[in-house]
Amino acid sequence: MSLAQDIAILKRIPMLSDFQDDQLRLLAFSAESMDYSRGQRLFDQGDRADGGLVITDGTVSLQTKGADGFEEIEQVGQGTLLGETALLTENKRPCRAEAIDAVRIIRIRRALFKRMIQEYPELAQRMLDQRVSRFRYTVSALKPVGEKMAELEQLNAERRVKDDERQS
């Protein structure tokens, strides 16, 4: 795949959408390209995450460990960024990623990403704005869940009172 194609894929990733073409070019040029065969593991659940992986070709199965072994939770393909948070802070991989077919990725190490942010501080502000917006959306989406849980807790408390009255 050409550098221009890599840049086009990177540009479609929401976290990188505010990057200018020259910034994406620098990122793509400095990142590491890796190929995986069908069935090969990109990473395991619990592995230390030192950056993000952008899928440029192929399909990846994301799996989590359950009581009966690993279970597929999602299949992702071209243009997916795995490990967005790992670009900014150290953490562990929340799932296993396995190549379903031939897969090519761009590996962006955290150190490289942080250098980009230091070099272009306006990117950090835009990413912060994006994260705040996503956080607000998540909070508002969870509000009805919280209300429903409070409602259920109230019903449960009322039921306990009635049960206590019957036993008395």
Q: Residues of each region from the PLM?
A:
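Short hydrophobic/aromatic patches on the structural cores and recognition surfaces of FHA
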Residues: 20, 39, 58-60, 79, ...
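A small-molecule sensor/coupling module
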Residues: 6, 22-24, 93-94, 111-156
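Short acidic alpha-helix initiation/capping motifs at coil-to-helix transition points
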Residues: 1-7
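Cyclic-nucleotide recognition modules
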Residues: 74-129
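Long, low-complexity, intrinsically disordered segments
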Residues: 162-168
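Regulatory nucleotide-sensing modules
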Residues: 11-65
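A residue-level structural signature of the nucleotidyltransferase/glycosyltransferase Rossmann-like core
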Residues: 8, 52, 73-74, 105
